[in-house]
Amino acid sequence: MLGKLDTWLTEHPKRKDLHGWRRFIVEFWFFGLKEARACLFAGLFFIAMFLVPKTGWLGISRYDLLLIFAVSIQAAMLYFKLETWDEVKSITLFHLVGFALEWFKTSGDIQSWSYPDEAYTKIGGVPLFAGFMYAAVGSYIIQAWRLFDLKIKSHPPYWLGTLCALAIYINFFTHHYIGDYRWYLVAFALGLYARTTVLYTPYDTTRKMPLLLAFVLIGFFIWLAENLGTLFGVWRYPNQIGAWASVHISKWSSWALLVMMTFTIVANLKHIKHTISVSKD
């Protein structure tokens, strides 16, 4: 069924009869449908996060249920060939990278945020499902790449993109000890990706936008999702222990940087590299 949906979403003959506001509405509609389809893993996972009772179900804790649900979604996507083994390996890497960050950020000396519920599948205070929140970002980018027939123009040399991604990840740890170099990294990324353009096809015509803008927009929607996650008490920041408060807006920049790091991993997949044009300058 999803295969037929994907075919319907991606295979369109050129519509020369569409102009003006009619074309805008059709393209905007298909853009929204493709975005929703690309968010399949993330969407189902967050729906489960909001629907599973805080007290759990059938004697199984909420965090354990979320892990079972996340693994089931991932297995189903692989079984129905919505993701390849190569992509699953990358998503597993996102899970491990995210879990390591979660473990550090929730450790006794740091306590940037916490997971208040009990569970059998918690390691060092972090439930195993937490890594899937990062994997969901990777899954979204992989699915969007195919559905929108993404192509990247004027991408910086891969080694520079990898260096930037590593620096971003390391700074998430080291800023607790030697200062936060986030804005220096933002400046570096602005220079690195200033000319990089992403080409995407919402319906039958290719459009383009700055890649940096895509990072910022995706980061914003993750920030919104994080607000919902803390509202439902799945995890919480120190300022939310007494009563809920919105996640600080500064987290938006952190998520945008994490999206950039995730993009770098996805860009190194074999079947995606051929869609990327590396700048020769």
Question: Model-derived features: where do they sit?
Answer:
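Aromatic-rich, lipid-facing transmembrane alpha helices and their immediate juxtamembrane interface loops
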Residues: M1-D281
